[in-house]
C-alpha cells in the first residue's frame, strides 16, 4: 500500500470535505505525502497545508486544470506549484469564469428536459460560488430523486449526448502545461484511462504532452483497473514519463478509492514525487 496520495478534492471545488478535514483524513489513513488538487482552484491549499504540517504530513500544493484537447475534455494535474504565481492564478481565474457560464447553460438544458430549479439547487451544494460543477448538479438531482447516486446522474443526464451535457472550451493543453511550469510545478495527465481516445489519438496526446514538457502520467488512480495500471505504466516507460498515484478522492460514497488506499506503482516506474 502506498503512503502517497497526489490527487484529491475539497469543498473548494467538487469535493465534500473541507480542506482541513481532508488533510486530517489523509493523516488518519497513513498518508505521508499528500496533495490537494482542486479543480481550477487554489484557495483551499493554505488550510490543507497548515493541518498537514501540524500532523507531520508532507504537503504538496496542487491543482487539476480543465483542458480541451480536440473534442475531448482532459484533466492535467499540476503538482508542487507555487500558488501565488501570477500566471497560474490568472489562467485559473479565466477558467472559473467559464465554469459559471457553463453552469447556467447546464441548468437551461435541464430545464428544457423538464427538471427545474437545478442552478439554485447546484449552488446550494457548492461551497465555492465560483466553482459550480457537474458534481453539484448531480448531488441535487440525487436529492430530487432522479437517480440513486451521482454516478447514475452523470450517465443519465450529464455526459455527452445526454440532456444536461454542455460543450465548453477549457484551457489548451499548452496553456495548462505552461502555467504549471511557470509556477515551478510538474504536470501530470490525470486518470488517462477515463478518456475515450482511439489508439492513434492516445499516441498523439502522449507525444504532444512530452513535446510540451509534460512530466508524468497518473498510472495508479481510483478509476483505473489493475489492467490499466499495467497499460499506462507501459506507456509511461515508452514515452519516458514518470508515474503518479492519486485516489481522486471526492468524499465518502462518491469515490472509487479512499485516501491512502492506493496500491504500489507497477515495478520499474519512476515516481513523480522523486521530482520534488
Model-derived regions: residue spans:
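An N-terminally biased module of ancient metal coordination in phosphate/nucleic-acid-related enzymes
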Residues: 1-72, 157-160, 171-179, 183-184, ...
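C-terminal regions of proteins
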Residues: 257-258
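Extended substrate/RNA-proximal surfaces in nucleic-acid metabolism proteins
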Residues: 51-210, 263, 267-269
Amino acid at each position: 500500500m502506498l503512503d502517497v496520495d497526489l490527487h484529491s478534492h475539497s469543498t473548494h471545488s467538487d469535493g465534500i470535505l473541507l480542506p482541513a478535514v481532508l488533510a486530517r483524513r489523509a493523516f488518519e489513513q497513513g498518508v505521508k505525502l499528500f496533495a490537494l488538487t482542486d479543480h481550477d482552484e487554489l484557495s483551499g491549499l493554505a488550510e490543507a497545508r497548515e493541518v498537514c504540517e501540524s500532523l507531520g504530513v508532507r504537503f504538496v500544493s496542487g491543482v487539476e486544470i480543465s483542458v480541451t484537447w480536440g473534442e475531448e475534455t482532459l484533466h492535467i494535474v499540476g503538482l508542487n506549484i507555487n500558488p501565488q504565481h501570477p500566471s497560474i492564478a490568472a489562467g485559473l481565474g479565466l477558467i472559473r469564469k467559464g465554469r459559471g457560464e457553463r453552469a447556467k447553460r447546464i441548468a437551461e438544458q435541464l430545464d428544457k428536459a423538464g427538471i427545474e430549479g437545478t442552478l439554485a439547487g447546484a449552488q446550494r451544494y457548492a461551497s465555492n460560488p465560483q466553482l459550480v460543477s457537474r458534481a453539484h448538479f448531480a448531488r441535487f438531482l440525487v436529492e430530487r430523486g432522479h437517480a440513486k447516486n451521482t454516478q447514475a446522474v452523470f450517465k443519465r443526464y450529464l455526459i455527452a449526448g445526454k440532456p444536461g451535457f454542455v460543450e465548453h472550451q477549457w484551457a489548451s493543453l499548452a496553456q495548462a502545461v505552461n502555467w504549471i511550469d511557470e509556477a515551478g510545478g510538474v504536470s501530470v495527465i490525470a486518470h488517462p484511462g477515463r478518456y475515450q481516445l482511439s489508439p492513434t489519438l492516445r499516441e498523439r496526446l502522449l507525444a504532444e504532452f512530452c513535446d510540451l514538457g509534460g512530466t508524468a502520467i497518473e498510472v495508479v488512480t481510483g478509476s483505473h483497473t489493475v489492467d490499466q495500471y499495467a497499460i499506462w505504466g507501459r506507456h509511461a516507460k515508452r514515452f519516458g514519463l514518470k508515474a503518479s498515484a492519486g485516489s481522486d478522492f471526492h468524499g465518502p460514497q462518491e469515490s472509487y478509492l479512499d485516501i491512502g488506499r492506493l496500491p504500489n506503482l507497477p515495478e520499474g516506474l519512476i515516481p513523480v514525487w522523486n521530482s520534488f
